[in-house]
């Protein structure tokens, strides 16, 4: 019998026409192997065409896109564009990956974490306004920016968030790193606020191997972002700088991959939605397992980058008695790089034992299954940071997990995954 392949959460998937290789080869053939060039320019135009489109075919937007070396770089430059400086405060969704909040600290500013509401799992507008008013009372000034996050591709309550932001005159940086192609009321996420952030990491909806982009409201903002991304050089015949710049521009080689990927973006989005629909159907009668669905409000149109679910605390999983008995030796979830060794297998805020047992069981079935993001306000690095929460994101972290949804995940894979979940449950 052929050995079963590992089913990963979301793997990079190239176009069948091999266009990624074509454009990369062109970069080498013409010696455009620097962070500028024809591929970068064309990729930006392709992204603009997509970002400015409306699903109902109505009048298009006129946003501009700047390609960068990473989504994290885009968050960093967006905060600079919002005027964030040392000592300022930035309101950011707590239930997110660390790249949403770390750039705040790069600038010497302070993250103020905002909790989630239970339907989208994203920033709660009620808590957002509460945080704005309380920070103004405590510090005498308003926060400098608001950073909502499209968790696993789910649109945030952008209409309510923008109304609050406009009310207090605070710019919005949309972290749509996980939400490439998600829409609200037909409009692409990342095009509502002052800036929008996209990610093309190897596990995202499309990839450039590593990379990201910033959506800007106009050419003036895009030019400023470009200036900061290319070391902020002034117009002299020698190198002079009146501001601190960064080396954040995307490589022309990587942009070639992105150009090819744009030809399959809509196919990828459709596939992820199809996988989500299969999970919803196949898991609907599994007691204690609940797939996270988008709101019934038709304005919400998620890309379902990853399919997330929750596991009731009273569901017993095979091997649960051994959960957290051993210290993890390698990164969980396909993370690259080096992890810092720890002495204990547990922390004061972690997934329930049955969720950890399910992760281990699924790993034995060659299925990648990982916990949802740990809220940033519960991370040791942010100990003591202000937080406005109702506890929803902490509870979701205890019970939530992610399932494979990428382009390589077949219908049979989804059926196998669901059968494995059923097998894991002790009856």
Where are these predicted regions, by residue range?
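Active-site phosphate-binding strand-loop segment of PLP-dependent enzymes
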Residues: 119-208, 213-215, 220
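Conserved PLP-binding active-site segment in aminotransferase class I/II-type PLP enzymes
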Residues: 1-81, 85, 129, 166, ...
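Conserved PLP-anchoring active-site segment centered on the Schiff-base-forming lysine
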Residues: 76-130, 134, 331, 346-347, ...
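Hydrophobic/aromatic ligand-binding patch that stacks against planar heteroaromatic rings
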Residues: 102-104, 164, 253
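Nucleotide-sugar donor-binding loop of glycosyltransferases
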Residues: 88, 94-96, 115-117, 176, ...
């Amino acid at each position: 019998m052929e050995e079963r392949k590992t089913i990963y959460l979301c793997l990079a998937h190239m176009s069948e026409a091999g266009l990624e290789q074509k454009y990369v080869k062109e970069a080498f053939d013409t010696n455009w192997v620097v962070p500028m060039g024809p591929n970068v320019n064309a990729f930006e135009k392709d992204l603009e065409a997509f970002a400015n489109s409306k699903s109902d075919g109505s009048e298009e937007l006129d946003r501009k896109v700047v390609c960068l070396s990473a989504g994290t770089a885009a968050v960093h430059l967006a905060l600079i564009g919002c005027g964030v400086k040392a000592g300022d405060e930035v309101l950011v969704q707590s239930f997110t990956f660390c790249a949403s909040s770390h750039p705040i600290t790069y600038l010497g500013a302070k993250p103020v974490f905002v909790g989630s509401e239970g339907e989208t799992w994203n920033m709660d507008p009620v808590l957002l306004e509460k945080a704005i008013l309380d920070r103004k009372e405590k510090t005498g000034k308003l926060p400098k920016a608001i950073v909502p996050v499209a968790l696993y591709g789910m649109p945030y309550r952008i209409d309510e968030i923008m109304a609050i932001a406009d009310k207090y005159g605070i710019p919005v940086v949309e972290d749509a790193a996980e939400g490439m192609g998600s829409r609200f009321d037909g409009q692409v996420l990342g095009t509502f606020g002052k800036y929008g952030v996209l990610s093309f990491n190897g596990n995202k909806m499309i990839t450039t191997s590593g990379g990201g982009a910033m959506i800007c409201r106009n050419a003036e903002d895009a030019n400023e972002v470009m200036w900061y991304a290319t070391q902020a050089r002034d117009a002299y015949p020698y190198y002079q700088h009146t501001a601190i710049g960064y080396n954040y521009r995307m490589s022309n080689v990587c942009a070639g991959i992105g150009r090819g990927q744009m030809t399959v973006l809509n196919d990828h989005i459709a596939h992820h939605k199809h996988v989500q629909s299969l999970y919803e159907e196949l898991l609907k009668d599994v007691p204690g397992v609940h797939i996270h669905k988008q709101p019934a409000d038709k304005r919400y149109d998620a890309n379902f980058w990853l399919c997330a679910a929750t596991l009731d605390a009273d569901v017993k999983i095979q091997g649960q008695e051994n959960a957290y008995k051993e210290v993890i030796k390698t990164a969980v979830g396909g993370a690259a790089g080096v992890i810092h060794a720890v002495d204990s297998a547990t922390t004061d805020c972690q997934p329930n034992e049955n969720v950890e047992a399910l992760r281990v069981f699924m790993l034995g079935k060659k299925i990648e299954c990982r916990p949802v993001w740990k809220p940033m306000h519960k991370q040791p690095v942010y100990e003591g940071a202000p937080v406005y929460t109702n506890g929803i994101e902490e509870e979701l972290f205890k019970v939530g997990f992610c399932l494979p949804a990428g382009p390589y995940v077949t219908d049979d894979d989804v059926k196998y995954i669901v059968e494995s979940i059923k097998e894991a449950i002790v009856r």
